[in-house]
């Protein structure tokens, strides 16, 4: 028989098992909170500067009279009646166009907005996943002829008029050719030197063919004006076939 001496442990040096169990969730929570805070900080830094050269200002949502609903939903009343707010269409949207509505009448049902992307003509993801018929399945060809809204030009926000520089971004990127740039002659603000000045100048401004526009939001999303776009989409209560 052999005896091996062991160091005596005091009650202060040994923590009860139930204390460890209490501390573990606390550590996990603090770690998770730290991770979220770090992620949020990185996102904020990404938004603040563009390559360290210029400050980025986020776009603000325009005040639309009529909300925009996805192609295939037929009308605002149809989607309000049949949508169960399951969020499948919002999750499936690859362009960050769909988001849950904050309106009490249509709470958590999908609503379209174009600050972060636009509704690409070749995408029909939301119509493929809807399980209730709130958004009917449509083909790419059908989508190109569905008018869910129309573009509206806001003169006071347009960069050629506010800054005296050429733009035309909306017309260049419109997938259906619904926007044309036309000459406009008048006194326009010109940024140069130390002070802003006005001078007579012919500039190009956009004109919208509302009969041809399908409301995809390409123009609104790609408009460089901040915080509000110089062109935005107003929704249609009932979708039209053009």
Question: Which sequence ranges carry the predicted segments?
Answer:
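Non-ligating segments of multi-cofactor redox enzymes
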Residues: 1-242
């Amino acid at each position: 028989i052999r005896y091996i001496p062991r160091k005596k442990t005091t009650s202060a040096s040994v923590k009860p098992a139930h204390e460890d169990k209490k501390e573990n969730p606390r550590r996990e929570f603090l770690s998770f909170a730290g991770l979220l805070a770090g992620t949020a900080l990185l996102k904020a830094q990404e938004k603040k500067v563009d390559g360290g050269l210029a400050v980025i200002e986020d776009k603000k949502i325009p005040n639309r009279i009529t909300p925009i609903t996805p192609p295939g939903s037929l009308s605002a009343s149809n989607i309000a009646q049949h949508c169960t707010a399951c969020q499948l269409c919002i999750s499936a949207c690859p362009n960050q166009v769909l988001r849950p509505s904050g309106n009490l009448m249509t709470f958590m049902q999908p609503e379209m907005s174009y600050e972060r992307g636009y509704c690409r003509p070749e995408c029909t993801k939301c119509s493929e996943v809807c399980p209730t018929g709130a958004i009917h399945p449509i083909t790419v060809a059908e989508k190109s002829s569905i008018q869910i809204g129309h573009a509206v030009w806001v003169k006071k926000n347009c960069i050629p008029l506010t800054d005296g520089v050429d733009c035309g971004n909306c017309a260049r990127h419109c997938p259906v050719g619904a926007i044309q740039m036309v000459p406009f002659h008048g006194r326009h603000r010109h940024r140069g030197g130390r002070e802003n000045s006005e001078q007579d100048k012919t500039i190009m401004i956009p004109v919208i063919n509302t009969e041809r526009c399908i409301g995809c939001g390409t123009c609104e999303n790609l408009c460089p004006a901040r915080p509000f776009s110089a062109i935005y989409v107003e929704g249609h209560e009932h979708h039209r076939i053009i």
